[in-house]
Design a protein with these regions (language model features):
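Beta-lactam-recognizing serine transpeptidase/beta-lactamase-like catalytic domain environment
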Residues: 1-181
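Calmodulin-binding IQ motif helices
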Residues: 184
Length: 184
């Protein structure tokens, strides 16, 4: 358990100590929270920006609206920790697909296109080594972790599961849970 202000963050299982790869493999909200707290708000916000989460995607397609992240001057630890595992963010399916393509593209972010276009702009957002390490962690998640039900034998793959509560109008989160999987 991780106690922050009046919030308690828990994982589905108790872990002694996890590596960054294991945090991804086992979907550790405590681990993701600690990383976010260590990075700090400005670096976390910058990383979300680099991965395309806070800007529009340059396609004209339904559901391609850009994501949202509350910009705050005085963020408290529990809010920062929640951003570490994706709460407080709203992103489109195209944005999550673009972000995960960074790991398969050796750390390069490429603008999302629906049709093949050889002139797609791209930029490095993480090192090849970091992309490789995250890709290996995503592969572990589909072999041994929370995404193993999505494993398809005979294919090289990686994925990450997610469980979220949608933001309610006003304040707080809806009680309904939504499950997701991103697979590369």
């Amino acid at each position: 358990r991780l106690y922050l202000n009046d919030k308690i963050i828990v994982d589905s299982k108790q872990y002694e100590k996890l590596t960054p790869a294991e945090i991804i493999t086992y979907s550790s909200q405590i681990g993701a929270s600690k990383i976010a707290l260590e990075l700090g708000y400005d670096d976390l916000k910058s990383n979300y920006y680099d991965f395309g989460f806070t800007k529009p995607i340059s396609i004209n397609f339904p559901s391609s609206a850009f994501g949202y992240m509350a910009i705050k001057d005085n963020i408290v630890d529990k809010e920062l920790a929640s951003l570490g595992y994706g709460y407080g963010l709203t992103i489109s399916p195209f944005q999550i697909a673009s972000a995960y393509s960074v790991f398969a593209n050796n750390g390069i972010f490429k603008d999302f296109k629906l049709l093949k276009d050889e002139n797609v702009s791209s930029r490095r957002v993480i090192s090849e080594s970091t992309a490789s390490n995250i890709l290996k962690a995503l592969e572990m998640a589909t072999k041994d972790g929370t995404g193993k039900a999505a494993n398809v034998n005979g294919f090289s793959q990686g994925g990450k599961t997610g469980t979220v509560h949608q933001i309610r109008s006003g304040s707080g989160y809806a009680e309904d849970m939504y499950l997701s999987l991103i697979h590369i």
